Design a protein with these regions (language model features):
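Generic structural microfeature
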Residues: 3-4, 25, 83, 147, ...
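Single conserved hydrophobic/aromatic residue that forms the stacking wall/gate
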Residues: 1-11
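Conserved beta-strand edge residues that scaffold enzyme active sites
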Residues: 44-45, 102, 166, 236
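Active-site phosphate/oxyanion-binding loops
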Residues: 10-87, 93-98, 104-124
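A conserved regulatory-domain signal marking ACT and ACT-like small-molecule sensing domains
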Residues: 108-268
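A generic structural signal for short, non-catalytic loop/turn and secondary-structure boundary residues
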Residues: 2, 90, 103, 124-126, ...
Length: 268
């Protein structure tokens, strides 16, 4: 390898065949060998409860479930590739994150175990486009929602988040390549509002419905920040919000201060 995190460089130079995917390779090999554990050494510091570039005094994350780690990776935790968790989960192989620059530092264990902490970490995903489709009643409600899914599928544009009612649908996407085509087709069925320069903020943890109170803590932290969308993840492992990018740093600090202060951690 000529540089860190690059593999399979041709003998005559040229572009590498794989860059930044060594954690995916490690978990794939570990799954194939049915390893007892996969250790991922990175030059990044330990996994924090929030990105230390934007937040003062983030806590360290010592343990995550596979689902929680996957959600964090999807929503922007740079220490993990979103695809590296699936092979380990398939074979139930724990993944340990270690710091190559400080080998004696505490590590983070990712496994199928859930600990007692409800809130684990906060992640943010930038370059989001928020779109609201308000039905003009040309279609009945179930056909209206179906039509939106069909058009996004037609133009191969994945949805990061979706919230719907019988009269309107709000979505968040990170790929605007075919957005003009999508809007053009859906304008005959809906009034369309588009806002760019948005951010998804995701609070990740063990958020089973019977654990009352965490929603109130989250909303209290964000009481002064306008929210475009609120979405509960289908896996019960995250609550996500869409906000303006200019509010990102303030939102992350407010959540970190509210959710990871000592008295809250002791109660959870």
């Amino acid at each position: 390898s000529r540089r860190q995190r690059q593999m399979c460089i041709r003998d005559r130079g040229g572009d590498p065949q794989l860059e930044g995917g060594d954690d995916v390779s490690a978990t794939l090999i570990g799954a194939a060998l049915q390893a007892q554990e996969v250790c991922l050494w990175t030059d990044s510091k330990e996994l924090h409860s929030c990105d230390p570039r934007f937040v003062k005094h983030p806590a360290m994350v010592k343990q995550l479930s596979f689902d929680e780690a996957e959600q964090l990776a999807f929503y922007g935790a740079k220490i993990l590739h979103p695809f590296c968790i699936a092979p380990a989960r398939l074979r139930n192989i724990p993944v340990r994150l270690l710091n190559s620059m400080e080998p004696s530092a505490e590590d983070t264990l990712i496994s199928n175990l859930q600990d007692d902490n409800i809130i684990k970490a906060i992640a943010a995903k930038d370059h989001i486009i928020y779109i609201k489709f308000e039905s003009n009643h040309n279609l009945c409600p179930y056909l209206f929602i179906s039509k939106i899914f069909d058009i996004f599928a037609k133009y191969r544009t994945p949805l990061c988040l979706l919230v719907s009612s019988n009269l309107d649908v709000s979505v968040a996407i990170d790929d605007c390549t075919r957005l003009s085509n999508i809007i053009s087709e859906l304008r005959q069925y809906a009034h369309v509002l588009v806002e760019d320069r948005m951010t998804i903020v995701s609070v990740v943890g063990n958020m089973q419905w019977e654990y009352a109170g965490f929603e109130a803590k989250i909303m209290e932290a964000l009481k002064d920040i306008p929210l475009r969308m609120i979405s509960y993840g289908s896996s019960n492992n995250d609550v996500a919000f869409v906000i303006k990018n200019t509010d990102k740093k303030r939102a992350l600090q407010a959540l970190n201060d509210k959710l990871f202060q000592p008295e809250y951690a002791e109660r959870n």
